[in-house]
């Protein structure tokens, strides 16, 4: 669960997009609410070992129908606010989690869609979660009993600083260190499950893989969560916990928790809330599916920021519109696999909503290090994120199983293992931006070409295509272009693709031969051609000139001819596609009587010498000697005729 800087960026994002002048003021006003102690000492919760890093070992599988219980939990001093009655609360969360299942995205709760809507779309309907809402149950104690934190204190004693578990009268406290968050969270989980089992009996349906274990349980508790800065430190911190619990004879493999409300505004030091969006729920459920966090758990480096729901992307539009899974995350789940790029090519990539995939560029010096390229546009679940920036996202991955399993993917600032290559070479993210304006300016230029119009990523550009093993990738991306239809075109290991030649009409068509020419193509050194009959290639070759003489054909053959331009080195240019074809027929090997026709034809002697052009029915008026002549029609057809 990523800590939200102050409510700072959260509230800034909630303002109308035209209110540019307010962003810096609001950012600075709220920044004091960002507790330095909290943002720098999140160690235990954020770094707690999780069974993440592999879908194969995840508690919840990412394919097929998976049933998940969602337990609504109120406290002795805090009830739900999304509705006035328990029935209303249940109905709200039924749709919040499951939507309507009628093929239409459910937006009635203010989010871009329901939890189920998100995962069905991201998985191409491979993963079909079904959420069973239970409760609300009411716990025996106040929220502070379950959410209180434990601190250690550094106290000045004489000239020394000592660490104590408890502050005594007269102690001079230098600072405090968070040693444990939500000290009674285990009691929260076990009590919530026990009370839920009193009102709901059929828990066997949540053992999706038949291993006699409930795969997971998700809690939604009433009120705010501690993840929003300025919040009460006694609130529970949303998270996913991989800790087996046995309650009433049932084994629960893991649980996750999120809050009902989020801060919407602040007045006279009182935070006014509204129902939270789907973002945090999606983030925590993704942990149960095996994904680690992609933010820097030390709150220093850029990580993935808004470009992943496993980082700040869960808070898109204040959590109401988290972004799409990245191409890496969809590949991780086995939903839409990455395509390996190994040969020079020119790609035109749609965004995910339009069927696009991600492409993997392997570092030849390391099997675990690679780039992923994908197209992010303001479409589908990227509708809000796409307002921040759009274009080609280049993600640098340096996989290490141990780092993934320990949930420390981006915890080393100078060796981030899952982060973007920013087109503007700027990484002022939520951890380091001094203002909302600076943060948004960074995002606007992160993707290629971005607002800095960076069309290339090579070993020599800024930024350069660097890797940890080997120094440089040596696989350039050039001419990165966003097209009007929302696709992105990129040249991989090449300057581009040659234009297809423009064919002229064939000439000198005889029974067994013809000539044909085409326009020359810049940077082409050769041309490949094919002669096709009945769908099969009957002749092919390569020539250096923009013309070819073809012979050895059969009479009366209906032919297709096309050509493509070729370059010497694919790293300079790659071959063109095939040209548009010319269709025509060779001459027949029989002689027709002079036809009656008013069509204009060219008349040739039997050895191919042009004689004249006229209408067919006028030929008998001309002073031709008796003999065989060839009539060639404007559509390329020819025939032999006998003039007596």
Give the positions of each predicted feature.
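Conserved aromatic anchor
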Residues: 512-524
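C-terminal tail/sorting-segment detector
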Residues: 19, 587-590, 626-644
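Non-catalytic C-terminal accessory/binding modules of secreted extracellular proteins
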Residues: 21-31, 81-145, 151-152, 229-271, ...
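Active-site recognition of the HExxH zinc-binding catalytic motif
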Residues: 219, 279-293, 373
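Extracellular fibronectin type III
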Residues: 555, 568-587
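Active-site-proximal segments of metallohydrolase catalytic domains
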Residues: 52-60, 109-251
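Residue-level detector of functionally pivotal "anchor" positions at catalytic/ligand-binding pockets or at interdomain
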Residues: 495-509, 581-607
């Amino acid at each position: 669960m990523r800590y939200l800087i102050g409510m700072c960026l959260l509230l800034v994002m909630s303002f109308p997009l035209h209110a540019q002048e307010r962003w810096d003021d609001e950012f600075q006003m709220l920044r004091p609410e960002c507790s330095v102690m909290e943002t720098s000492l999140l160690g235990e919760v954020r770094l707690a070992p999780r069974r993440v890093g592999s879908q194969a070992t995840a508690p919840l599988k990412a394919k097929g129908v998976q049933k998940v219980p969602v337990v609504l939990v109120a406290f002795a001093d805090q009830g739900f606010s999304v509705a006035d009655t328990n029935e209303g609360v249940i109905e709200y969360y039924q749709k919040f989690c499951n939507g309507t299942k009628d093929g239409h995205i459910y937006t009635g709760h203010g989010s871009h869609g329901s939890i189920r809507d998100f995962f069905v779309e991201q998985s191409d309907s491979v993963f079909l979660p079904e959420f069973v809402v239970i409760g609300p149950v009411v716990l025996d104690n106040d929220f502070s009993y379950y959410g209180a934190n434990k601190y250690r204190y550094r106290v000045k004693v004489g000239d020394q600083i000592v660490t104590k578990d408890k502050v005594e009268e007269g102690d001079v406290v230098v600072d405090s260190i968070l040693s444990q968050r939500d000290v009674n969270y285990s009691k929260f989980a076990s009590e919530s499950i026990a009370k839920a089992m009193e009102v709901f009996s059929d828990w066997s349906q949540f053992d999706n893989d038949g291993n006699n274990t409930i795969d997971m349980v998700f809690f939604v508790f009433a009120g705010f969560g501690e993840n929003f800065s300025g919040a009460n430190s006694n609130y529970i911190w949303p998270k996913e916990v991989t800790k087996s619990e046995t309650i009433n004879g049932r084994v629960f493999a893991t649980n996750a928790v999120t809050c009902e409300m989020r801060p919407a505004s602040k007045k006279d030091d009182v935070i006014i809330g509204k129902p939270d969006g789907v973002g945090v729920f999606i983030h925590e459920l993704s942990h149960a599916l095996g994904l680690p966090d992609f933010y820097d758990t030390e709150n220093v480096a850029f990580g993935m920021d808004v470009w992943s729901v496993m980082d700040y992307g869960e808070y898109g539009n204040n959590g109401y519109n988290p972004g799409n899974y990245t191409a890496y995350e969809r590949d991780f789940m086995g939903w839409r696999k990455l395509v390996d790029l190994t040969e020079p090519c020119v790609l035109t990539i749609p965004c995910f909503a339009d069927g696009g995939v991600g492409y993997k560029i392997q570092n030849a010096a390391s099997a675990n290090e690679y780039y992923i390229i994908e197209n992010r546009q303001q479409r589908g679940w990227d509708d809000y994120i796409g307002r921040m920036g759009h274009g080609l996202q280049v993600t640098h991955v340096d996989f290490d199983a141990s780092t993934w399993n320990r949930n420390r993917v981006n915890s080393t600032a100078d060796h981030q293992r899952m982060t973007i290559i920013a087109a503007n070479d700027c990484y002022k993210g939520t951890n380091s931006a001094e203002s909302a304006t600076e943060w948004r300016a960074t995002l606007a230029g992160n993707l290629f070409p971005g607002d800095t119009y960076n069309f290339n990523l090579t070993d020599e550009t800024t930024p350069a295509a660097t890797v940890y093993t080997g120094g440089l990738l040596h696989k350039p991306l050039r001419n990165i272009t966003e097209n009007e239809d929302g696709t992105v075109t990129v040249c991989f290991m090449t300057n581009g693709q040659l234009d297809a030649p423009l064919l002229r009409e064939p000439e000198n068509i005889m029974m067994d031969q013809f000539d044909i020419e085409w326009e020359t193509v810049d940077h082409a050194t050769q041309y490949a051609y094919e002669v096709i009959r009945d769908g099969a290639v009957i002749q092919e070759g390569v020539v250096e000139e923009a013309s070819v003489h073809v012979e050895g054909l059969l009479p009366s053959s209906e032919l297709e001819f096309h050509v493509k331009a070729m370059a010497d080195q694919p790293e300079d240019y790659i071959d063109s596609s095939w040209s548009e074809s010319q269709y025509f027929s060779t001459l027949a090997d029989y002689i027709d009587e002079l036809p009656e026709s008013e069509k204009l034809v060219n008349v040739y002697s039997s050895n191919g010498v042009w004689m004249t052009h006229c209408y067919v029915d006028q030929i008998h008026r001309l002073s031709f000697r008796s003999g065989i002549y060839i009539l060639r029609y404007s559509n390329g057809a020819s025939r032999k005729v006998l003039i007596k």
